[in-house]
Regions:
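Short glycine-rich substrate-engagement loop in P-loop NTPases that contacts/grips substrate
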Residues: 56-83
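Conserved lysine of the Walker
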Residues: 33
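Hydrophobic positions on the alpha1 helix immediately C-terminal to the Walker A/P-loop
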Residues: 36
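Single conserved hydrophobic/aromatic residue that forms the stacking wall/gate
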Residues: 156-166
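Structural recognition of the conserved hydrophobic beta-strand(s) that form the central parallel beta-sheet
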Residues: 113-119
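Short regulatory helix/loop adjacent to the ATP-binding pocket of P-loop NTPases
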Residues: 123-136
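Hydrophobic anchor at the beta1->P-loop junction of P-loop NTPases
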Residues: 25
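Pre-Walker A adenine-sensing motif
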Residues: 5-17
């Protein structure tokens, strides 16, 4: 499946790159938060190949041992690399119990540029300013707009028509 670049969201992340805010990407399930984080990671790596990116995806069983805030906090700190720009990407952060304690602790250390995604009702409805002690920048990701849907559908339709005409 072809990845549809959603430039409006990527540009928002690029604009806050390196700011001290905790960047929070929210949206309903399957709206493209994880794909946005992947695209942003690719952008960062192309601009700063020497950086250190600590990525945790709680959708994968590889990270089941990090489901407590203390384990998450310790894991990130164990992967810190002094002398490099350190980024933390945590996908579906709400799956970690008391995740805000880990995120607040990492943010307070001032060693990381932090990006998290979440999709549960608690994270979507909560006041992020009270959940996180530091400043936050929220990007709300929505499912495809009608224009995006039509662009994908038209591309698929054209490929199908071309195949039939051969």
């Amino acid at each position: 499946m072809k990845l549809i670049e959603r430039r409006q969201y990527l540009d928002k992340l690029i604009n806050v790159l390196g700011t001290p805010d905790i960047k929070v990407i929210t949206g309903v399930r399957r709206s493209g938060k994880s794909k946005l984080l992947e695209a942003f990671r690719a952008y960062i790596e192309s601009e700063n190949p020497d950086c250190n990116i600590i990525q945790i995806n709680f959708n994968l069983p590889d990270y089941d041992d990090l489901l407590t805030y203390r384990a998450l906090y310790d894991y990130v700190n164990a992967h810190y690399v002094a002398g490099k720009e350190n980024f933390v990407f945590i996908d579906e952060v709400q799956m970690c119990k008391d995740f805000e304690k880990a995120v607040n602790g990492l943010h307070a250390s001032e060693k990381y540029d932090i990006y998290i995604t979440g999709s549960n009702a608690f994270l979507l409805s909560s006041d992020l300013a009270t959940l996180f002690t530091g400043r936050t920048f929220e990007i709300k990701v929505y499912p495809f707009s009608f224009r995006e849907y039509m662009a994908v559908s038209y591309t698929h339709l054209r490929a199908h028509e071309t195949g039939r005409n051969l």
